[in-house]
Regions:
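CoA-thioester-processing core
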Residues: 88-94, 102, 108-162, 175, ...
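Glycine-rich phosphate-binding loop at the start of an alpha helix
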Residues: 67, 82, 86, 109, ...
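A general structural signal for well-ordered alpha-helical segments in protein cores
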Residues: 11, 70, 85, 145, ...
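A structural preference for short, pocket-lining loop segments at secondary-structure junctions
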Residues: 11-19, 30-77, 92-101, 120, ...
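Acidic, divalent-metal-coordinating active-site segment for phosphoryl/phosphodiester hydrolysis
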Residues: 165-171
Length: 256
């Protein structure tokens, strides 16, 4: 377990919150493991009816998550064939019960792509969304190469992936990436209010409704596997090395 993930249970609702503000809530392997354990426990728990992923202390420039902690990942994956990040992505993909994302700050990389596996996505007005994989010499992950075009359209998805552009909450709502947007001042209260609507709904009906809508698990799994091969290859590539070096030096990357 890690102190950088806060897990709370209240009134049939599980809250899983990023709690690493000093690192912009960048996600480490330990954090992925803690989230995986929480999602898997929730999936087989009849008492709790909704799980919400959010961040503590967002607002005033704080982040939902800045994505993966590259320094932590550079030390090498744990369980080479099934690292914690892959376990987490499969856990949220396979979860039969409602998952909610309450995005209360910038959501970068996996911060965006994890929302594609959530059934409801609420965003604060100040939240933003970006998937700058190509800027890092990487490729889309979490089946986002399949799910993002379906959510916002092929042209918009290619714009997000290829330019690394940042979407505002207003744009994300208009495109269909998020379910609802709320003013920052009321966001936490409204997100919890709606999460409780889900938590208090008929549980079997909710499960069946989710299963009917999200009925393409095999296709999504295949896409995640294909992405992971390209992602792993790019992690070992000169392009990734140049991208990280340029980012650390705050200078433009050069790809010969």
């Amino acid at each position: 377990m890690t102190d950088h993930i806060r897990i709370e249970q209240s009134d049939r609702l599980i809250t899983v919150a990023f709690n690493r503000p000093e690192k912009r809530n960048a996600i480490t392997q330990d954090m992925y493991q803690a989230m995986t354990d929480a999602v898997n426990a929730y999936a087989v728990d009849d008492e709790n009816r909704a799980l919400m992923i959010t961040a503590d202390g967002a607002g005033d420039g704080a982040y939902f998550t800045a994505g993966n902690d590259l320094q932590d990942f550079a030390m090498g994956p744990r369980g080479e064939n099934n690292p914690p990040v892959i376990q987490f992505l499969h856990a949220i993909k396979d979860c039969p019960k409602p998952l909610i994302a309450a995005v209360n700050g910038p959501a970068i990389g996996v911060g965006l792509t994890l929302t594609l596996h959530c059934d409801l996505v609420y965003a604060a007005q100040s939240a933003t969304f970006s998937a700058p994989f190509v800027k890092l010499g990487l490729v889309p992950e979490a089946a986002s190469s399949l799910l993002l075009p379906e959510a916002i359209g092929m042209a918009a998805a290619m714009d997000v992936f290829m330019t690394g552009r940042t979407l505002t909450s207003e744009e994300a709502l208009r495109m269909g990436l998020i379910s609802r947007m709320f003013d920052d001042a009321e966001f936490d209260a409204r997100a919890r209010e709606l999460a409780m609507v889900v938590a208090n709904a008929a549980p079997n009906a909710m499960r069946h409704a989710k299963a009917l809508v999200r009925n393409r698990n095999a296709e999504i799994t295949d896409r995640m596997m294909a992405e992971s091969v390209h992602f792993a290859n790019q992690l070992q590539s000169p392009e990734f090395g140049e991208s990280v070096a340029a980012m650390m030096a705050k200078s433009p990357a050069f790809y010969p």
